[in-house]
């Protein structure tokens, strides 16, 4: 186990209750520094409560939160960027005026804020929006502005709650690119809450899954996929299906098979964890004409569904 000092964010046995509803029940999570950490779970799982604690909006009833190895305190909020799911731009202000207002709230001087805003507005191709009324912006346009506002002060930890909702595919990909760039170039740690599992597959290196206020699983994405794979392989061959399945015996589990008229069969097989795929392939080539053999690809969607069953 890595030590707390290597973590951007640590939650230890955190609990929060609203009346009779337990929103978080003894949740412990560690977010490694410089990671893009996916916070997953169905609606009502406790994700928003957890995020609001980290952002300093609410406090836990019990448990501890640490920010880069020290107890999270009010002053740390200046080093946290937060894009909430419920967008919060003021409709009756101009875009540039409002962006400057939020930058000043983060402690930035006017000249520094104007310089950074100019760079970001150009990068995200919104430099023509400075004098627009916020009320004239589409959902996707407003989302871009709020994304800029959340990262303008170069936070050490960036919290993104459903950051891609409201974007078309082109702009969603642009935001994904910026999230990766913030991590790779600035060393920003990102806490990403989303229902979009394709984004988790594309962006996240670590995840935690919460459900009904409890943590169900946590870990590196590659290791969670490997565990969910459970020795399953995609195996395609040409030959006699009945003879091959008989030869398999107890050495592998047949999960599924799809056959074509020319005696080509696509299988999903489960081989024991202690059996290297190379050893299985060497045996199989003596039995049938092997067309392909590879570890089964497991998406985070499958990991999620298996965990909450």
Q: What does each model-found stretch correspond to?
A:
Residues 2-4:
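Pre-NBD coupling/linker segments of ABC/ABC-like ATPases
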Residues 272-309:
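C-terminal coupling/interaction segments
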Residues 177-270:
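ABC transporter nucleotide-binding domain
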Residues 12, 236, 294-296:
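Solvent-exposed beta-strand sheet faces enriched in polar/charged residues
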Residues 6-9, 16-211, 217:
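ABC transporter nucleotide-binding domains
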Residues 68, 107, 146, 226-229, ...:
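A generic structural signal for secondary-structure junctions
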Residues 33, 128, 237-239, 271-273:
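Non-catalytic surface loops within mature trypsin-like serine protease
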């Amino acid at each position: 186990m890595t030590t707390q000092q290597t973590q951007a964010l640590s939650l230890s046995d955190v609990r929060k209750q609203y009346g009779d509803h337990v929103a978080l029940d003894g949740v412990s999570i560690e977010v490694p520094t410089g990671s893009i950490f996916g916070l997953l779970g169905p609606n009502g799982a406790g994700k928003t409560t957890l995020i609001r604690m980290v952002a300093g909006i609410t406090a836990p009833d019990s448990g501890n939160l640490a920010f880069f190895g020290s107890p999270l305190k009010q002053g740390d909020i200046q080093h946290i960027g937060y894009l909430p799911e419920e967008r919060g731009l003021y409709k009756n202000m101009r875009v540039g005026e409002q962006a400057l207002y939020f930058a000043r709230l983060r402690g930035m001087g006017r000249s520094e804020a104007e310089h950074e805003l100019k760079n970001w507005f150009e990068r995200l191709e919104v430099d023509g929006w400075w004098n627009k009324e916020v009320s004239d912006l589409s959902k996707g346009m407003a989302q871009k502005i709020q994304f800029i506002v959340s990262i303008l002060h170069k936070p050490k930890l960036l919290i993104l709650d459903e950051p891609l909702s409201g974007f078309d595919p082109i702009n969603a990909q642009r935001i994904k690119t910026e999230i990766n760039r913030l991590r790779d170039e600035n060393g920003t740690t990102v806490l990403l809450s989303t229902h979009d599992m394709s984004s988790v597959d594309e962006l996240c290196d670590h995840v935690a899954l919460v459900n009904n206020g409890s943590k169900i699983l946590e870990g590196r994405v590659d290791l969670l996929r490997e565990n969910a794979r459970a020795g399953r392989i995609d195996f395609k061959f040409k030959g006699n299906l009945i003879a091959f399945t008989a030869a398999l015996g107890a050495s592998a589990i047949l999960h599924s098979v799809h056959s074509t008229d020319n005696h080509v069969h696509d299988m999903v097989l489960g081989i024991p964890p202690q059996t290297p795929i190379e050893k299985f392939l060497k045996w199989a080539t003596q039995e049938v004409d092997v067309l392909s053999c590879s570890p089964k690809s497991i998406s985070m969607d499958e990991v999620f569904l298996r965990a909450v069953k």
